[in-house]
Amino acid sequence: MAAALIALAAGANLIAPYDPNFAIRGTGLMPNGDPVGPSAEFLLGTDRLGRDYWSRLLHGARTSLTVGIGANLVATTVGTLVGSVASFAGSPTFRIGIGARRRSFAVPVETILMRFTDVVLSLPVLLLAIALVAIIGPSLLLVTIVIGGLLWTTTARIVYGRMRLLRELEFVVAARALGASSYRILWRHVLPHVVSLIVVYATLGIAAAVLFEASLSFLGVGVPPPAASWGVMISEHAGYYRTDPRLLMLPGAAIMLTVLSFNLLGDALRDALDPHRWG
């Protein structure tokens, strides 16, 4: 299902019969100005401005998945770096000063990074994202960066916890005894054992990012109109919930199916890549 959604989003320009932002005059609206329902000309009808709804749903998939995958790449990269550095940095000692006045001090890198992660975890991320986007101005790139910059904490905690366990195992102790640097141990011996875990949670993170983007767009601080976005489509037609619920149900169902498909994909990957499952 996730692959089908990605294929539809990637081929939106080829599949969509109309420009998603083009208001079709004449046949795009009823004589009284209401949206047209599903027909042979318009597969899923039109919206309040006479734009083809099927075309907007397809391009909305592209927008939502672009933000979801892009934000998740940011979150996964930042979270992996923070968790990796925190698990192996410890509290390095530095010396400053001149001659007899040189002093040694330890910098608790591990503690600093993980306490900072806890602080970010405690923040109301939706309110913070709304504030950041409202101050700077909404755009596709900004929304992607903001979402990724707020969702990295879960990956950081997971990577940190797994690497703390791995660094005490015999193969890591042996590599350290042979003189391998912390950098080599991390990237050559430990990280390969964490990649499968990162892939699983990265897949689950796409679902969270898509839902996050839809929430921001619904509140008017996400992808700016007239760009097609499922959250924008729901927001634009909030007043049609009685007269034409199709305008709300279709993008809502698209969001639900996308989140569900990536959650199921993440669960399947976790079962397939879990070494304990196969004994």
Predicted regions and their residues:
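N-terminal signal-anchor/first transmembrane alpha helix
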Residues: 1-23, 113-116, 194
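Alpha-helical transmembrane segments of integral membrane proteins
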Residues: 3, 49-279
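Short membrane-interfacial helix/loop motifs at transmembrane-helix boundaries
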Residues: 11-55
